[in-house]
Amino acid sequence: MPYDAVVSGRADAASDTLTRFGAIHLAAVRAEWAAARAAGLDLRVADGGGLLLGAAPTFPSTMFNRGLGFTEQPGRIGEALAFFAEHGVDGEIVLDPADAPSGIEPRTRLDAYLCAADRIDPAPVDGLSLHVVDQDEVDAWVEVIVEGYAPIPEVAAIWRSTAPHLVGISERILVIGELDGQIAAASSSYLADGVGWLSWAAVLPSARGRGIQRSMIAERARLTFERGCKDVAAWALVGAHSAANLAGAGMTWIGQRVVIRASDLA
C-alpha cells in the first residue's frame, strides 16, 4: 500500500473520532440548554442541520451564547454570525484550530479526549464513596457544583433552578461523592449514541488533592459502560489540572478545539 494511502486512512480515522466527539458534545449541550429553558431562562435556540446555536441576551455570561457544529461545518460560520447579530449577543463559536483565522487569539483552547469506557481503571480513594443521585439529593448535588466552580451569582442561580430538570432522565447520570461520610464531590455525564459525555465535576476545596476527580472519572466511565455506552468523551482547558486528570485516568487525547468570539470573526 502506498505511504500516502496509509496516512490518509489514519487521517480519516482521526477525523471520524473528532466527529463523534463533536456529536456527543452537541447532544449534551442541547440537553443542558433544554433544562435551562425548562427552568425559565430566556434562551433562544436554533437547532438543525448539524448545528446548534444559542443566545441568551439578558444573561450576564457567555455560557449560553454559543455555536456548535462548526468544527465539522466551518463553511457555515456566517450563519452563526447572523444568528448572534439577530439576537444582539457576541456569541462564541467552537472551531478546529486549523479553521481559526490567523491573527485571532482564541478566548479558550481546549483539549479533547475520547476512549473506550471499559479502558479506564478504577481509582479508589480511602474514605470516598460514590453513588448515583436521586431526586431527593439533587439540591445537595448542585450546591457542591456551585461551591466548586464558584460562578457569578446569576450563573449560580440558573444552575440551581436547572438542577431539578437534570435528575431522573435516563440519558443523564448525576453522581455525588462522600468523603468519610461528608458530601465532598459531585459530577455528571450525559449518554447519547453509545458515548458518555463527562461534564460537570467539582470537589469541595477542603477535599481537594486526594485524587477524587480521577476517581469520579473512573466511576462515570464504569456507569457509562454499564448502561451500554462503548466510549466516554470529555474536554478540558489546555494545560489545566482537569486535562491532566483526564490523561492520567487513561483517556486518549484526540485533538484540540478553540473558542472564538463572533465579533472577532465578523
Which sequence ranges carry the predicted segments?
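Acyl-donor-binding surface of acyltransferase catalytic domains
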Residues: 70-136, 239-242, 258-262
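Conserved active-site tyrosine of GNAT-family acetyltransferases
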Residues: 101-102, 245-247, 251
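Conserved acetyl-CoA-binding loop-helix of GNAT-fold acetyltransferases
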Residues: 74-82, 203-205, 209-226, 244, ...
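A conserved beta-strand-loop-helix scaffold within acyl/acetyltransferase catalytic domains
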Residues: 153-206
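Conserved beta-hairpin
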Residues: 44-49, 97-105, 124, 171-185
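N-terminal charged segments
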Residues: 1-86, 92
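Short amphipathic alpha-helix that is part of the acyltransferase structural core
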Residues: 1-28, 68-71, 75, 112, ...
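Conserved hydrophobic beta-strand within the GNAT/NAT acetyltransferase core sheet
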Residues: 93, 198, 232-236
